Amino acid sequence: MIEEGGNKRKTMAEKRQLFIEMRAQNFDVIRLSTYRTACKLRFVQKRCNLHLVDIWNMIEAFRDNGLNTLDHSTEISVSRLETVISSIYYQLNKRLPSTHQISVEQSISLLLNFMVAAYDSEGRGKLTVFSVKAMLATMCGGKMLDKLRYIFSQMSDSNGLMMFGKLDQFLKEALKLPTAVFEGPSFGYTEHAVRTCFPQQKKIMLNMFLDTMMADPPPQCLVWLPLMHRLAHVENVFHPVECSYCHCESMMGFRYRCQQCHNYQLCQNCFWRGHASGAHSNQHQMKEHSSWKSPAKKLSHAISKSLGCVPSREPPHPVFPEQPEKPLDLAHLVPPRPLTNMNDTVVSHMSSGVPTPTKRLQYSQDMPNLLADEHALIASYVARLQHCTRVLDSPSRLDEEHRLIARYAARLAAEAGNMTRPPTDASFNFDANKQQRQLIAELENKNREILQEIQRLRLEHEQASQPTPEKAQQNPMLLAELRLLRQRKDELEQRMSALQESRRELMVQLEGLMKLLKAQATGSPHTSPTHGGGRPMPMPVRSTSAGSTPTHGPQDSLSGVGGDVQEAFAQGTRRNLRNDLLVAADSITNTMSSLVKELHSGAEAEEQAGTEKTREGLPPRGTFLSVFLLHTWTKLAGCQTHSTSRERSQAYGKWGGTA
């Protein structure tokens, strides 16, 4: 008794699992019933993996399970329904890649319990065929146009006219879905639902039905159906816009823009829950956007629209012919009953007046076609046996198989009775049969080899996709080592970029110095020391970051440069200005070369010295070099003017004080 009670509780928990998960999503806080219903049914669709199955796969499953041969009012048991659902999901897993397989047993349990709760509330354990078709066709994935075409085919007669009784039955079954997710008060079935969809039309064809169902807005009782499809389309749409209420940086799904408040936009969660801020009110009209357009695209569209370049909007669906399409002729799958006696053929040939040799030639020419039909029949029968995953105990299926076997046996018996043919025909037919058997054997061998190769490749793929325990144990170590290597690489790259930047600054300063020296050296022969008509050399702009020049470090190694410059200018007019400049230039060049070598030889010492100087408030070595070059070229440029030796000595005193 205790075990039975535990099993009952487990069964009830499985039946209520989908509804418990749906309540956990808190869809009831959505204030609009249409969006609330569409969100709930979309959750059921995705949770049961029905969004992966389109309407064409559903039709194939109906035919495989023989539902297309049953009347709509026929009732099937829950076990038969479970067989149909199982075939749907097993075929789905065959189409999906190995990395995207679904849990078939869980999907079967969830969908079966949901369908029983929605369509068998009385607990009779039976559902009608039309209920199963209506529910699965409505909840499956795919295009809405294809769904509506299939639904119309189930409600129309042979002339393509919709029967209002069938439409009423479809609405009754379809509106059980909102009722199953506790939205019956908003979208429950009423007796006037049919007339609300088609109030005046008397004859409804396919195109009229599609126009009504896909209109904007659709019929009130089915307004949740197109919204559920639009939810599926915009789930992954990204809007780079900030929500005006929750201030999230971007939106996913629908975007709502107020038509009264300037640039007031809400994400779908805030709009559905009725959130508002500032001067905005829930009574304001909102426009729903299912895509994002950049301002450039909006501007181009507005210009094209104003110029009349926008193409006309395409119709929501193509126009289908009024007359329904004729069903496919599948008579070749079950061949006609063969003749029991070949005398009928002989009589027909003799009555037509054809001579006997011509009759024999025609029979010999028809033999390959007959053999091809036989082999095609065998191949189709074997394919059907291999394709059927489950054997259904349906009387129609068994009768069809018995009829097929009987006709094939009759054909074999008829061929066995044709042993009275001439020897030439028998030998020719024997050779043809032998060649056909050899060809069949070769094709079977090739098919067997191909199947073995496919199986081998599938096993290799599965083994490669499943990591071994040793690899799983080594993976953390490899990942840690890879992380350390990447961190070390980043540090080295930062170090290299810093060194390159420092080297680039020094090279720029050296290039400027050499250009100034060359310009001064080339301009000296044409400029007399006593002539004041020459233009002074442009002075470089002084950086505000250059403070007082430090009196230690690299400054000591440059003290000789200042001495050479002072010595070069101390002689006044007694020495040639050109020689003085050359001596000063050589001294500066040698000093700068030694400074560059010193900078490159002690990278770590420079960083430490730079840190100490930064703490003491002193500028780095590059700043000192800039100040030194600035003052040096100030003195060199001042030599071209008619300054007295007294002014130059004052300038030297100022230089020494600055240094």
From Swiss-Prot:
PROSITE patterns: ZF_ZZ_1 (PS01357), ZF_ZZ_2 (PS50135). The modification Phosphothreonine is found at T11, T69, T179, T212, T424. A zinc finger (ZZ-type) spans 238-294. The keyword Kinase does not apply. It comes from Mus musculus. Residues 520-562, 599-620 are annotated as: Disordered. One of its GO terms (molecular function) is DNA binding. It is found in: Cytoplasm; Postsynaptic density; Cell projection, Dendrite; Basal cell membrane. Keywords: Acetylation, Cell membrane, Cell projection, Coiled coil, Cytoplasm, Membrane, Metal-binding, Nucleus, Phosphoprotein, Synapse, Zinc, Zinc-finger. Disruption phenotype: Homozygous knockout mice for Dtnb are viable and fertile, and are normal in appearance. Double knockout mice for DTNA and DTNB genes have a mild myopathy plus synaptic defects and abnormal motor behavior. Its main location: cytoplasm. Expressed mainly in liver and lung. Expressed in brain, namely in neurons of the cortex and hippocampus and in the dendrites, soma, and nuclei of pyramidal neurons of the hippocampus region CA1. Expressed in kidney, namely in epithelial cells of renal tubules, collecting ducts, Bowman's capsules and glomeruli. Expressed in blood vessels and pia. Residues 429-519 form a coiled coil. SMART domains: ZnF_ZZ. Scaffolding protein that assembles DMD and SNTA1 molecules to the basal membrane of kidney cells and liver sinusoids. May function as a repressor of the SYN1 promoter through the binding of repressor element-1 (RE-1), in turn regulates SYN1 expression and may be involved in cell proliferation regulation during the early phase of neural differentiation. May be required for proper maturation and function of a subset of inhibitory synapses. This is Dystrobrevin beta. Zn(2+) 2 binds at C258, C261, H280, H284. Residues 521-530, 542-558 have a biased composition (Polar residues).
